[in-house]
Each structure stands twice: as C-alpha cells, then as structure tokens.
UniProtKB/Swiss-Prot annotation:
Cited function: Involved in the biosynthesis of methoxymycolic acid. It catalyzes the O-methylation of the hydroxy group of the hydroxymycolate to form a methyl ether.
Pathway: Lipid metabolism; mycolic acid biosynthesis
Encoding gene per record: mmaA3
One MF term in the entry's GO annotations: cyclopropane-fatty-acyl-phospholipid synthase activity
GO cellular component, one term: plasma membrane
Name of this protein: Methoxy mycolic acid synthase MmaA3
A matching Pfam family: CMAS
Amino acid sequence: MSDNSTGTTKSRSNVDDVQAHYDLSDAFFALFQDPTRTYSCAYFERDDMTLHEAQVAKLDLTLGKLGLEPGMTLLDVGCGWGSVMKRAVERYDVNVVGLTLSKNQHAYCQQVLDKVDTNRSHRVLLSDWANFSEPVDRIVTIEAIEHFGFERYDDFFKFAYNAMPADGVMLLHSITGLHVKQVIERGIPLTMEMAKFIRFIVTDIFPGGRLPTIETIEEHVTKAGFTITDIQSLQPHFARTLDLWAEALQAHKDEAIEIQSAEVYERYMKYLTGCAKAFRMGYIDCNQFTLAK
C-alpha cells in the first residue's frame, strides 16, 4: 500500500467525498430505504418481491458466494448501515469487522450489531482500508470501490489479497460503466441530456465518484493475483431498486423537505429517477465479481 503524501492526501479527499453524501442525514435516507437500511442494488428473485424482501435476497446472494463457515472473520469494506454484517453474523455465525468513512454510519452500525444475540465479535471502525492491517478470512465490498479513485485500485486489491489466507474469497459488488467506444458499439445514444446528468451525479450527488468498466476491474484484480470465478450482472434489479426508492421518497416528500429542504428533495429525486433511466438504457450496469486467491 502507498504510504506517501499523495496517498494520504487522496485518502483524506475520499473521507470528505464520502461524508458529503452519506452523512447528509440518517433520517432522510431512512425515508426511502427498506427496514434493513441497505443502500445498494436489491435482488428481485421473484416479481412479487417487496423492496425489503429483495434486499434480504441480495444479502443472501452476496454472502452465499463467499464460502463462509462458523468462526471465520468477514471484513466489510464500506459497510454502509450494517445490513451485510448483521446478516452474516445471524446466518453464518461469523465474526465481522466493518470499515466506513461515514460518521453517521459508524454510529448506526455499532448500535445494530450490539443488538444481535451472538458470541461472535463485531467491530465497526471509522477508518480507511489503507489503515487496516489485520488478517481476515473473507472480504466483501458493496458499491464502495466507486469512491476509491482508479489510482488506488492496485493498492486496494493488493491489500485484499494479502489480508486473506490461501483459500480466501472476496465478493466485489460495483456499479460499472462503459467507454465511449463501447456505448457507440452497443448502439446506445450519446445525448447531451445524459452527459449533463452524469456531470450532475459526480458533482452534486457523489463528488469524486468514478465508475470502473468491467475490463478495468478484471485488469486490476488479476494483477493482484485473484482469479475471477464469476461475474453476475444485476442491471435490471438496480433499475427497479431505484424506482422503489424514488417512489418511497416521493411518498414522504413533506417529511424529506422538513428534514432537509426542497432543494435536497428535488436533487435526490433527479438522482434516483435519472439513474434508473441510465440503467435501463444500458449506460451503466451493476456487477458482482467473485474473486478467489
């Protein structure tokens, strides 16, 4: 891992960018999230699933790819509001460590895990992965790598590879983008409207965020020594997730404005509905990469 001044500065920048979005307000996010407080793509195994059911299905889909056994230690990089760790402890009887750069999520996760009836250890650290040096058995990271910056990918995957034993497995869940050439080859229209929307997302919603292509992920994980054993696209599932988030936020419009402001409400509605459209048009995808040592 890089320990030079540039790396340190970038880490601090990541903290600022993450907190700018995720520390907006727990109460605001709760208006459109399901009861698990999962803020990532759901998995609709059946058409009649509720958002809550689909989020639990996504947690099970994710954890089921890791080969977890009782007593193992699972590291969750970018642990959100703790739903993955909670499910892992309850269903797989493992120890969990969560890393987050969000102060609000750090406090919330600890409260969630403290309520779980288990003898396994559970810790949530307000820390960047670059400052974590303990051995773990499995690693999961869901929609976090988009905040890292491409220049940190090699260090991150090297960190993950070295943290696990010889049979280690990592589940990387990431939104992925396309090169302009790929957009053209697939016949997806290049419009000024979408260009402006992408600028809005990286400026007003996820400052500093960058989407990797599938090829970028493949390049960096194999360079670190991993073998990709499976790639699963969740593209239509994310479009539906965003639809349901937007519907829920719209249904709580007055509360959202009271908690934040009309400007924030309108900004988030634009973000949720616009991203759903981007997934349906094929500009972006969401993929789960299963990585084995």
